């Protein structure tokens, strides 16, 4: 089963959550937001760790807009190091387990 952990701050800081399936709209992840009063993870991710599988990030909901390359097991301490902005991701696609 594919698994990815995301954080709302760089260097695995702040709040974290885990996904095991694609999320076509991070705004719909109600109750999983990084701070009290935050309803979702849309435009909140700043670092991540791919535990298993292959994953791809998208600028807009529904896997729209700019797409990143596909990432396999490994980690990114700062989205800017991967070539895109922090707090930019609006959907996540699991490519494989």
Q: Which residues does each predicted region cover?
A:
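Compact beta-sheet-dominated domain cores in extracellular/mature segments
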Residues: 1-97
